[in-house]
Design a protein with these regions (language model features):
Chain B
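Active-site environment of divalent metal-dependent phosphoester hydrolases
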Residues: 23-25, 58-61, 99-103, 127-128, ...
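Acidic/histidine-rich helix-loop elements
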Residues: 22-34, 61-71, 159
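Mid-to-C-terminal alpha-helical segments outside catalytic/metal-binding sites
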Residues: 1-22, 27-51, 222, 226-231, ...
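Active-site gating/metal-coordination segments in enzymes
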Residues: 67-155
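Catalytic pocket-lining loop regions of alpha/beta-barrel enzymes
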Residues: 117-119, 131-233, 281-282
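Active-site neighborhood of phospho(di)ester-bond hydrolases with catalytic His/Asp-centered motifs
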Residues: 15-18, 52-54, 94-96, 121, ...
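Conserved, mostly hydrophobic/aromatic
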Residues: 19, 43, 80, 112, ...
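Divalent metal-dependent hydrolysis catalytic cores, especially in the metallo-beta-lactamase
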Residues: 20, 38-66, 91-96, 118-121
């Protein structure tokens, strides 16, 4: 099982312990995960994606289970070539942070990026939030990704594949039930921020949407990696082993060979 | 599920959740019984020996959650007492009060203790350092009741529907009442936990529960470093999956086994009256 939501590098608004690839490899082994889609955390607040992407590929090179998920911003000159370059270098998914770039839902540039990712057979990886709103720095004014962003991107083309991490039940349901059945099939969600018991939002979503819509994400190094597995372990007895999707299956042609 | 470990859950050592909530038919939710069942079921899966719980009035149905009316306080406490009586082997409870109705609050504590309440729950009805809270703490001292106080970690502004307090406010109250143990609620429950830890460090009669939906890496490590394991209490509040995550994290952040036991249950056993948790003490 692949962790679709991991980063390396420091976080601008607080200290996070050991956000380095070697530590991530040890954590994945401890959690018995086969690998992770890894982004460069500080890049979310950078303007030019290139230095962060270069740092990401260099840092991950020695670690075959850490799969690069670099950032492409479609309002940056030359982004199409940048996308082609990172795909050629082994990117397994493409991160975008439209809320950090001031890009509104339905913006043609984001739609173009979604279509370009589909052409490259890479999932477009979106992050709803890095931290709880209640503890966010006054300087962190981007706000959460909206359901409208996701709905617009899911409607851009039949080959589009979108993975959304860090959403709660409300955003997931608003998006899912605001799409056609075909469009829903283009969107996957991690459940790191979805509440378990006693509210049992996760169990509810599995029942109503289907387990295949969900992938495994931890939000390391920001959050405890134990949380997603705890959510699985506390499912009601009739929902144990729900059969969620392995994010690794969403870009099968490009996953780097794993050590056996 | 292939590829993700489904580990054997820890069932061997005692475990006390010092911050739990139950619902009742006056709580405005038709699924209130399902919520209560889900908490007990998840608690059994995690290995919770005792839930120390409260009912917050009508949870906003007939008066605000954090400003409950006297009638809702009483009705909620009655529901909590009944639930605790029906599950006496695993549920203990706090008497919830609103300090704005001082006479009612004091009478309610006396009444609830007679019904087996083991602590006092204060919400966000009045800021923690307000003198109006003093009579309640004086009664808690006489009755040797711990006080679980709802806290916002580092309040930088007012938030709607609550008169929030933070670690500094609670430290002021605790300094005035050194014989009372105050449980600072949900270190992971929103706001900036990093501010809370130094705010209460020099006030030894404040301990922190680890509950809340927040599972920031580094929070447990810093809590242990600044407060020490003997001032931390494991708890879940509204999200039991985050409680389980933090429980598992306690095993990998380098704590000695004795420290883990302190956080799991021994600190709670020390804070509450002797005999409150007989199944733990037997273990």
């Amino acid at each position: 099982m692949i962790d679709c939501a991991a980063w390396i590098g420091p976080y601008p608004f607080r200290e996070v312990p050991h956000p380095d690839p070697a530590t991530l490899v040890r954590v994945l082994e401890r959690e018995r995960l086969t690998g992770a889609w890894v982004g460069h955390l500080p890049s979310a607040w950078h303007r030019d994606p290139r230095p962060g992407n270069a740092a990401l590929f260099a840092a991950l090179a020695p670690y075959p289970t850490l799969l690069p998920a670099p950032m492409i911003r479609p309002d940056w000159p030359g982004w199409e070539q940048m996308l082609a370059d990172v795909v050629a270098k082994g990117a397994v998914a493409i991160r975008a942070y439209p809320q950090h770039w001031g890009i509104q839902p339905g913006d043609s540039r984001m739609n173009a990026l979604a279509r370009a990712c589909a052409t490259s057979a890479r999932p477009l990886l979106l992050t709803v939030r890095f931290e709880d709103l209640r503890q966010r720095s006054p300087l962190d004014v981007a706000g959460d990704l909206s359901a409208a962003h996701v709905r617009a991107l899911a409607r851009t083309g039949e080959d589009v594949c979108i993975v959304v991490t860090g959403a709660g039940r409300e955003l997931i349901e608003e998006t899912h039930w605001g799409l056609t059945p075909v469009e829903r099939g283009r969107v996957y969600w991690d459940f790191a921020w979805v509440w378990g018991p006693p509210e049992e939002h996760f169990a509810h979503l599995l029942r109503t949407m289907g387990a295949e819509r969900f992938v495994y994400g931890t939000h390391w190094p920001l959050r405890l990696t134990q949380n997603s597995r705890a959510n699985l372990d506390l499912l009601p007895a009739d929902q144990r082993d729900p059969g969620i999707t392995d994010a690794g299956s969403l870009s099968p042609r490009f996953v780097r060979e794993m050590p056996t | 599920m292939p590829g993700v470990a489904m580990r054997e859950l820890p069932q061997t050592a005692p475990l006390i959740d010092v911050h739990a909530h139950f619902y009742h038919e006056g709580a405005g939710r038709s699924d209130w019984a399902r919520l209560n069942d889900a908490r007990v079921r998840a608690g059994d899966t995690i290995g919770v020996t005792y839930h120390v719980a409260s009912v917050l009035g009508s949870y906003g149905h007939t008066s605000p959650t954090y400003f409950p009316s006297p009638a809702d306080v009483t009705r909620g406490n009655d529901a909590m007492a009944a639930l605790a009586a029906s599950q006496a082997d695993r549920v203990r409870w706090y008497a919830t009060v609103n300090p704005n109705d001082t006479r009612h609050a004091l009478a309610e504590i006396e009444r609830c203790v007679a019904l087996s309440a083991v602590g006092v729950k204060l919400l966000a009805s009045r800021r923690a350092d307000d003198p109006l809270v003093d009579p309640i703490c004086e009664l808690a001292a006489r009755q040797r009741l711990p006080v679980l106080h709802h806290i916002w970690q580092h309040r930088t502004r007012d938030w709607p529907n609550q008169e929030i307090s933070d670690g500094l406010d609670l430290a002021c109250l605790a300094a005035r009442h050194p014989k009372v143990t105050f449980i600072l609620a949900h270190l992971g429950g929103g706001g900036d936990w990093a501010h809370t830890l130094p705010a209460i460090r020099e006030t030894p009669n404040v301990v922190a529960d680890l509950s809340g939906s927040g599972v920031d890496r580094g929070m447990l490590d810093q809590a242990v470093e600044i407060l020490g394991a003997r001032r931390l209490l494991w708890a879940c509040d509204l999200t039991m999956e985050t409680g389980l995550a933090k429980l598992r994290a306690l095993d990998v952040i380098g704590l000695a086994e004795g420290d883990v036991m302190d956080v799991r249950w021994r600190n709670a056993a020390r804070i509450f009256a002797t005999g409150t948790f007989p199944r733990c003490e037997l273990a």
